[in-house]
Amino acid sequence: MDISDELVAEINELRRRRKAIILSHYYQRPEVQDIADFVGDSLQLSRTAAATEAEVIVFCGVHFMAETAAILSPYKTVVLPDLRAGCPMADMAEVESLRSKKAELGDPVVVSYVNTTADVKAESDICCTSANVVRVIESISPDRRILFVPDRNLGAYAARQTGRELVLWPGFCCVHDDILPEHILRAKRKHPEALVVVHPECRPDVIDLADKVASTSGMVQFVRDSSFREFIIGTEEGITHQMGKLCPGKKFYLPSRGMVCGSMKLITLTKVRDALKRLEPRITVPEHIRYRALQSLERMLAL
């Protein structure tokens, strides 16, 4: 048994003893995805965290994801293996700035992407993910003004899909916003038989070049069900691990080399083991914030 096998065995034993569930986002390292009980997108992970009977949730993702699990499951122990695993886009929306913008607009409906902090969710009316953003926007009365926080690209996509005019917060995902049309066009020249599949956090001019726009779970389902054998994947590179496992024989190409989320890659097997041992770093949310943030999440999950 080599060191990695010993580490996995130790994680499995600690998971059993702690009555824990390990949740992983698609953008995690391959070896972390492989030891998880569930791998999914933000919406799937939120639903799993809310429904689990496990006593401990080890969240292999970034801080806002673990925070969301703590909001939905306040009596569970939620641990994030590395506290440095933050989300730059979530940090682009600060609660005081949001309050000021709400006052400026005069009672807008605030739709916050789950890629936000708990206090921003608490100031919001409803949350959304990339998988359900269109459904969320369509659920809002057409006579209400909508402020979309924080991803300008996802908001622009939702506006185009629904025909609604949204006030967009000027945030973005560094990985997706760095994908440019020339990257897609170059990849198409190199792989002319490949379909282009991109995430709605990409720029509008990149989305215009895509054959399919979908959330991470939607991307996985699309490539699995497609009769095509080659795909250019416009999202963080970690997703290609699950695609490769589910679709042996199909080929996946990244349009540029910079499609890596450094925060997601901070989580390692050693840190997962240590988190299970110590039940730290634990993620908690003050009750007065948790209660209000929960309302926004529950409105989303009810759709």
UniProtKB/Swiss-Prot annotation:
Bound cofactor: record note: Binds 1 [4Fe-4S] cluster per subunit.
GO molecular function: 4 iron, 4 sulfur cluster binding; metal ion binding; quinolinate synthetase A activity
Family that this chain belongs to: Belongs to the quinolinate synthase family. Type 2 subfamily.
EC number: 2.5.1.72
Function per UniProt: Catalyzes the condensation of iminoaspartate with dihydroxyacetone phosphate to form quinolinate.
A Pfam cross-reference name: NadA
BP terms from Gene Ontology: 'de novo' NAD biosynthetic process from L-aspartate
Name of the protein: Quinolinate synthase
Reactions catalysed according to its record: iminosuccinate + dihydroxyacetone phosphate = quinolinate + phosphate + 2 H2O + H(+)
Binding site for [4Fe-4S] cluster: 87, 173, 261
Pathway recorded for this protein: Cofactor biosynthesis; NAD(+) biosynthesis; quinolinate from iminoaspartate: step 1/1
